[in-house]
């Protein structure tokens, strides 16, 4: 998951 874009 990506913490900036909030996607996995």
Curated annotation (Swiss-Prot):
Annotated tissue distribution: Expressed by the skin glands.
Compartments in which it is found: Secreted
Name the record gives this protein: Skin secreted peptide 4
GO cellular-component term (any): extracellular region
Entry superkingdom: Eukaryota
Keywords: Secreted
